[in-house]
Amino acid sequence: MDSSPPNTIIEEAPPRFSELKPPLSEDIIEALDRSGFEVCTPVQAETIPFLCSHKDVVVDAATGSGKTLAFLLPFIEIIRRSNSYPPKPHQVMGVIISPTRELSAQIHKVARAVRLDFAKCREVEADMNTLEEEGANLLIGTPGRLSDMMKRMEFLDFRNLEILILDEADRLLDMGFQKQVNYIISRLPKQRRTGLFSATQTQAVADLAKAGLRNPYLKCEADQKSSQLVHLLIENKNKKLVVFFMTCACVDYWGLVISKIPSLKSISFFPTHGKMDQKGRDTALASFTEASSGVLLCTDVAARGLDIPGIVYIRSLAIKDREVLEKGLKAFVSFVRAYKEHQCSYIFSWKGLEIGKLAMGYGILSFPYISEVKQDRIGIVGFTPVQGITFEDIKFKNKSREKQRQQNLLARKDKLQQEKRGKRKKSSKEAVDDSNKASRKRKLTGRQRQTIQTAQDEEEMNLRL
């Protein structure tokens, strides 16, 4: 009989406040211990590190989840780190907007229980004369009261505000406070941290998040970028967009692929890159500028100095026809090489590039040979080669190109057979020539070596296909 214990699910213990990264200050930890707060709730464990790391947050948090401390503790930590510490009496460093006076009073009570003697926390429902005389560094109130106070009280200084919190954001909008909330946001500095806490994530909350967050972005996996690009084009088919690609080969490939998608047939595409002749580039740019809608596909040849009116989006990325297959391979290899050699290595991190997923996003059927990629990395998680396809059977739609390909294919096969039979033996003169070639190769410049390597890679890919 098997005496091994049954499978059990081991739940990870919630972290303590002293274990959070980046760490909270020692005196904050001591104040929490005195108040009986030692272990984080899930909301606190997820939210506090983000806010303390200069990130905006949108949090799905119900009542009783510990969200009040989740935004109060980062505020305290942020103020202590700021250049304005200690703040002046009327220097407002944080604003917390809540839907009701009762909730504002509750937040104020928690803030007074855990705050340190570094700032004045004030509920705006308090006596205005007291507020004017003593000032406040953290304001907590309803949208109506806060917006009215901001209009009338010029003595409060919001220029160095560090954090804005919207508590119960869904209720704020349901109760008709959107106008006041928008006014408050418009009066505050854009360089701040913003936190939206809501029990439900409605479309109105999402719209408010877009308005309140600064420099927003969505993280997209490498194998999903192509589908997200198509989605963006469909959603904005009557507008003007610019899509930047890493290399000229990428422009050629994606220009060919997306123009054949049925749902994008009504969109005009204008490809341009540095390997096109000047007349072709000028024609593409002029046509795109004059068009009422369309998509400009380009490399950095169009990154500077162009003034094209009406552009809504600028996007950077990062049919059974052999032309698509070969252009896809060339585009993928050129992207990988350009990514590795990019000067901005902090952003274009070679070690962090998910090559397998990237290949899936490019529609690669079988992983090609790339000199920059070690062979043991080809089996990276995320790439699944297509089975049951003979690549030699994929033909060009263009009959003349297909005829030439067949001739080249036969020539390569004959060459390989001759090499296998040993009919091609090097003479002593050829050996000397090879030695001279190796000597000359060592004297080549980096660009020359790269050109030779590219040609060799393309030859290798042709042999594999």
Swiss-Prot record:
SMART domains the record matches: DEXDc (SM00487), DUF4217 (SM01178)
Q: Which GO terms describe its molecular function?
A: ATP binding; ATP hydrolysis activity; poly(U) RNA binding; RNA helicase activity
Q: Where does this chain carry the motif DEAD box?
A: 167-170
Q: Where is this region: Disordered?
A: 413-465
**UniProt cross-references to Gene3D superfamilies, sorted A to Z:** P-loop containing nucleotide triphosphate hydrolases (3.40.50.300)
Keywords annotated in UniProt: ATP-binding, Helicase, Hydrolase, Nucleotide-binding, RNA-binding
Residue ranges annotated as compositionally biased, kind Acidic residues, are 456-465
Keyword Nucleotide-binding in record: yes
Residues reported in the UniProt entry to bind ATP = A61, A62, T63, G64, S65, G66, K67, T68
Annotated EC: 3.6.4.13
Location of the Helicase C-terminal domain: 228-422
Sequence ranges assigned to domain Helicase ATP-binding in this UniProt record: 48-219
Disulphide-bridged cysteine pairs: none
Recorded superkingdom:
Eukaryota
Q: Which reaction does it catalyse?
A: ATP + H2O = ADP + phosphate + H(+)
Q: How does the entry describe the domains?
A: The Q motif is unique to and characteristic of the DEAD box family of RNA helicases and controls ATP binding and hydrolysis.
By sequence similarity, the record places it as follows:
Belongs to the DEAD box helicase family. DDX55/SPB4 subfamily.
What is the protein's name according to its record? DEAD-box ATP-dependent RNA helicase 55
